[in-house]
């Protein structure tokens, strides 16, 4: 199953006691499928993967694979600081039914480009899943450069990249270097429309947790080259883009989800959204239902 369009980087919903909330998880998956998303990421950084137990990881992934039922691709976050552990986690994801591994650059270690290349080649050779590279230097402390991506893209088991740098020049460099069959995804909601107009294949989104249809429509417009319409639609989503950047991900998006009845809170060391932002969270949550209804009508009409 190929990758393109809108993919949601899912949160992990917890209950009031901080335990994994399976019921809320299933409702979140159903919301995404009903909203027309074209893929889901399980246990990435938005999913607070670093706080999950192995048992929770297995339960989330297995239940998602069953619930999705082959309708859209399921990507599992498997990137860890060490190569051997990343390979092991990728094998674990494969055993649980994932279709792809989303592999972030090793956090905190800060390998050079040669080390990053060797790391990804080892995971691609030994992990048992097609690999989507994930570059987010603001969180990991290292930057996977386009020339290194170009070298890695020649491996048959390395099939794409989620690029979270908002730089237009970075995305254009990746597009210029990619081979056929290698997909380039924006990992930044606010600049994704521009990236897709330039030729990127889709968006791995945070805000689509609450607005799956709205971000599906965003991707559809951008990939169709509808520049006038995309500017207007992106402007409607701009407050959500800005809100999701008010604090560390996934603090803001989980505040919105809680307001629409999915999950409670985060796990330490993350704390809930500051009280000073509650009014804007309430205001945006009040807009979700109407915006999703409008988006659904536009998707059907298209």
Swiss-Prot record:
InterPro entries: Aldolase_TIM (IPR013785), DapA (IPR005263), DapA-like (IPR002220), Schiff_base-form_aldolases_AS (IPR020625), Schiff_base-form_aldolases_CS (IPR020624). Pyruvate binds at residues 46, 204. The keyword Transport does not apply. It is an enzyme of class 4 (lyase). It catalyses: L-aspartate 4-semialdehyde + pyruvate = (2S,4S)-4-hydroxy-2,3,4,5-tetrahydrodipicolinate + H2O + H(+). It comes from the Bacteria. The active site is at residues 134, 162. It is found in: Cytoplasm. Pathway: Amino-acid biosynthesis; L-lysine biosynthesis via DAP pathway; (S)-tetrahydrodipicolinate from L-aspartate: step 3/4. Keywords: Amino-acid biosynthesis, Cytoplasm, Diaminopimelate biosynthesis, Lyase, Lysine biosynthesis, Schiff base. Gene3D superfamilies: Aldolase class I. SMART domains: DHDPS. GO terms for cellular component: cytosol. One of its GO terms (biological process) is lysine biosynthetic process via diaminopimelate. GO terms for molecular function: 4-hydroxy-tetrahydrodipicolinate synthase activity. The record marks 45, 108 as: Part of a proton relay during catalysis. Its EC number is 4.3.3.7. Its main location: cytoplasm. Belongs to the DapA family. Homotetramer; dimer of dimers. Catalyzes the condensation of (S)-aspartate-beta-semialdehyde [(S)-ASA] and pyruvate to 4-hydroxy-tetrahydrodipicolinate (HTPA). This is 4-hydroxy-tetrahydrodipicolinate synthase. It comes from Xylella fastidiosa (strain 9a5c).
């Amino acid at each position: 199953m190929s990758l393109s369009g809108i993919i949601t980087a899912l949160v992990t919903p917890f209950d009031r006691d901080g335990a994994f909330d399976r019921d809320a998880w299933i409702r979140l998956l159903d919301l995404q499928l009903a909203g027309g998303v074209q893929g889901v990421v399980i246990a990435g950084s938005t999913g607070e993967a670093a706080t999950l137990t192995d048992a929770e990881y297995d339960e989330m992934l297995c239940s998602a694979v069953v619930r999705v039922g082959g309708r859209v691709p399921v990507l599992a976050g498997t990137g860890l600081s060490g190569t051997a552990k990343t390979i092991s986690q990728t094998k674990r994801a494969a055993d649980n039914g994932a279709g792809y591994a989303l592999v972030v650059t090793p956090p905190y270690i800060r390998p050079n480009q040669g080390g990053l290349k060797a790391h990804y080649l080892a995971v691609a050779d030994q992990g048992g899943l097609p690999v989507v590279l994930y570059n987010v230097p603001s969180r990991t402390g290292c930057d996977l450069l386009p020339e290194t991506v170009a070298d890695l893209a020649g491996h048959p088991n390395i099939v794409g990249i989620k690029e979270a740098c908002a730089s237009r020049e970075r995305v254009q460099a990746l597009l210029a270097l990619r081979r056929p069959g290698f997909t380039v995804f924006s990992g930044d909601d606010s600049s994704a429309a521009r990236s897709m107009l330039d030729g990127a294949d889709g968006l791995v989104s945070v805000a689509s947790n609450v607005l799956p249809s709205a971000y599906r429509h965003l991707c559809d417009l951008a990939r169709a080259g509808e520049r006038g319409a995309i500017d207007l639609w992106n402007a409607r989503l701009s407050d959500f883009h800005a809100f999701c950047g008010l604090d560390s991900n996934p603090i803001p998006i989980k505040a919105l989800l809680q307001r629409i009845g999915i999950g409670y809170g985060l796990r330490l060391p993350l704390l809930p959204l500051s009280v000073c932002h509650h009014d804007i969270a309430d205001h945006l949550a009040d807009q979700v239902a109407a915006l999703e209804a409008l988006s659904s009508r536009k998707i059907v009409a298209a």
